[in-house]
Amino acid sequence: MDRNILLGLLLALACLFVVMDARANEIEQRNAIAADVRALVESRDFAALDALAVRYRNPAERTGSGVWKLESYYTGLADVITSRRPSDAFRKKQAAFVDDWITARPNSASARLAAAMLLENHAWNIRGRGYARTVREQDWAPFRDYIERSRMYLEQHKSIADVDPHWYASMQRIANSQGWPAERFQQLFEEGTGKYPGYYALYFTATVYLLPKWNGSAQSIDDFARRAMRGTAADEGAGMYTRIYWVAIDSQFRDGFPENSKVDWALMKKGIDDVMAKYPDDWNIQNFAYFSCLAGDKMKAASLFARMGEQPDMEVWDSMERFKQCHSWATQTRLKSAAQ
């Protein structure tokens, strides 16, 4: 085949893959990253696991919604090496895998984070994921012991592992599990965001720490969202305010939004616009339309539905009935306004 023709075909194929990737929805992108991680774990390709993590530490490596791909890397890793109901054989196998990873690549940040992840997951398997009142008294001591082991491991290997911003997200989860006082948690958060100011997971795990059901209140969420917005305004505008409330809605407020929160909806709308200016992804559009419905903002919901793709994403809406209610409510208003 003529060399120029071959190059043309290869270029066209590359463009096709770019288009296909752009059209893939958010969950498909995240699942694809997780699948890559799973394949590398199963093939025991330690070098490739590290190379992928290094690649995803680049702030430019994001999904269509703007979320760092590094977060999906660690979610995928957790899905492979941990389980909520692991057998003894599974635990031993995965511990051996992580040990082998560390032996083969002792300076791997991701391998060290994986080891801490195993300890943390075992703690939660002992405790259970329910409310504190459902935990058996005899399970508290071993839960706290394994959480402390995870904290100590992270501290011991900080010089290796904190080249990865997820070290700080991991430590913030531990801080939440141990109920650190606000001052101590704030010091950790400021250290992490001082090194990695754009890593969303640091803001998201801090949001969970500040939820009313954990260590904070609705007011502490709003105060934090405003501080975070000011610190990231040069890159995000008001987008961080909106993203923090996104986590708060998913983690606690949900159908009690906005009544149970202290949100400034006008500011959150500005944040929606700022996120959409950089990441006009259908995942963002549908979530923001849903939040607009919860907030009772018909005009904002209608404008977002006008930009939405053809299919509702059930990861956003939970049910087709919920989507139809919101869509009908917003669209009918828009049609009436257009007719006047």
Where are the regions that the model predicts?
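Bacterial N-terminal signal peptides
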Residues: G8-F17
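Short coil/linker segments at helix-helix boundaries
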Residues: A47, R55-N107, M117-D235, G239-K270, ...
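Bacterial N-terminal signal peptides that target proteins for export
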Residues: M1-L9
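Intrinsically disordered, low-complexity segments enriched in Gly and acidic/Ser/Thr residues
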Residues: S251-K300
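N-terminal mature-domain "stem" immediately C-terminal to a signal peptide or N-terminal signal-anchor/transmembrane
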Residues: N25-S65
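Sec/Tat signal peptide C-region and signal peptidase I cleavage site
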Residues: M20-A24
